[in-house]
Amino acid sequence: MDFPKIHESEYRFCLIMWEYEPVTAAQLVKLCQDQLGWKRTTTYTVIKRLGERGVLKNDNGTVTSLVSKDEAQACEIDELVEKKFEGSLPAFIAAFTKHQAMSEDELDEVQRMIDRIRKGGSQ
């Protein structure tokens, strides 16, 4: 399934929506004003655009997501790996771990993911 592109400022909006949903558009205006410094019109414009692209649903002023945070993050990572690492997950991991230390707990968690994938399960 193709997921709609969520731009950076829209993603910050979505983080708020995902945290509070279902949430009224009026509540989102207040939250975006407090957390992002947005004006009322900016919030309503983003709600309209994301609704048109299938990211959220605005049903009589109640906003809910149609794309989950996990789905949006997975799509962004897929795009990043494809665009910057020529589709190579090992190249991405090598670049990430070159400058990013991982704790023993994180390494154990990654190993469990690999083990599940090898057994035919999902992450």
Predicted segments, located by residue:
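Amphipathic alpha-helical dimerization/coiled-coil segments
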Residues: 75-120
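Minor-groove-contacting beta-hairpin "wing" of winged helix-turn-helix DNA-binding domains
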Residues: 61-68
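A short, conserved structural fragment
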Residues: 51-61
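Short acidic, hydrophobic short linear motifs in intrinsically disordered regions
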Residues: 23-32
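Short helix-to-turn junction characteristic of helix-turn-helix DNA-binding domains
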Residues: 17-21
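Short, hydrophobic-biased segments on the C-terminal half of alpha helices
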Residues: 44-48
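Short helix-coil-helix linker/hinge
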Residues: 6-9, 22, 86
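Short alpha-helical segments that sit at the start of domains
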Residues: 1-16, 71-72
